[in-house]
Amino acid sequence: IPEDLMQKYNFAVIAPNGENGFWLDGLSTTRKYCTFVGAELVDYVRRTFRLALSPEDTYIMGLSMGGFGALHTAFAFPDNFGKVAAMSSALIVHEIAGMKPGEDNGTANYDYYHECFGDLDSVLESDSNPEVLVKRLHDSGKKIPEILMSCGTEDFLLEHNRQFHRFLAEEGIAHTYLESSGSHDMDFWNEYTRRFIDSMFAD
């Protein structure tokens, strides 16, 4: 996070480690990354440092796997976050749905995804799918954090991000989705980190 923006807008950054677990409460493990970030860490920061005392002042941001995690966590704990920014998000639930033991997608194998997401035959209908969480909020009329997304046009995750963008649009869920030239790299993320922080703190 650029220090000049931290000083300009007077905000603190809390950066936990998700250990390549997609920031999920691993359905096949006892790891609770989503609950930790979305509830426990927020509560700890508020009690200990007296920071981000309201959801309107609490934002969550991530890139790649962290982009998936930021969206999923914001939708799982919408009362704790005012805005979510996600860049080049690894929104791969449709890609891994139905994967069988012994299979892989060139990035990881069935065992890894099963450990993170649980039953891959039912992952599309599960709470590991951000689509399920945000649609549930929308259908019930509950608050949805403001959504900001971006992806580079040369990013290998572009179609996954476009698919999620189309899903939100079809469901009538307000969001900002931006594309521009760029790959899955720090050049793109540095640009959109600045753009999104300026946008998030512009109000």
State each model region's role:
Residues I1-D203:
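Non-catalytic cap/lid and distal C-terminal segments of serine-dependent acyl enzymes
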